[in-house]
Each structure stands twice: as structure tokens, then as C-alpha cells.
Amino acid sequence: MISCIPDERTIRTALSLASRAPSFHDAQPWLWRVASDSLHLYADTDRRGPDTDVESRGVLLSCGASLHHCVAALAALGWRTKVQWLPDAAEPEHLAALELYPHPASALDVMLASAIPRPT
């Protein structure tokens, strides 16, 4: 099966929900890039607290939360994801590449994604 990208509205919705992920000091240290056939997650280490997150652990945890929210949102919107971790060893900020495939959303997918926008 060949990976493809959904329409712009679906991508915007998924990335909007991904941006609601909790982050260390509310820094939102992630960057999402859309390619012709995949989505890419990058760590933005310039947004880490230089005194409080020296080893960028908070950045990585925050990016993982954003990735989770993106995958959950895409599942609810009818897209299955295949995540490739650290796709480019020469570029350590490139944390993940997501291949997307159309797939029917389940009731559980919708329920999980519906919990994302709720304030905690």
C-alpha cells in the first residue's frame, strides 16, 4: 500500500489537536512538516528551557505527547499511521516520519480523539 496525504482540512485538524499536547513549561517544542506523502515531527530545541532542560528530556517528552495526539486525531479522521522513529541519524531533531493510509475510524478512535481538546 502506498502512503498518501489527506486533504488540507484533515491535516490542519490533526495538527491542531497535536498542538494541544501538554509540554514542558508550555513551550510546545515541536515542529510539524508536511511532505508530499508523509508528515514529519521535529524537535525544536531552541524552545527548551536552557537552565531547566539541559538534556532536552522535556522536549522529547513533549514531542512524544504531540505525536500521540496527532496519531489519535488521524485515526479518528480515518487515517492509519505507520511511524518511523528517528528516520535520519544525521539529523537528530527529526524525531519521526509518519506514513498515512486511509482506514475506517472505529468508535474507540473517535472517543480517544474527542478527549484531546478537553482542558485538564
Where are these regions (language model features)?
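Acidic, surface-exposed loops and disordered segments
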Residues: M1-T120
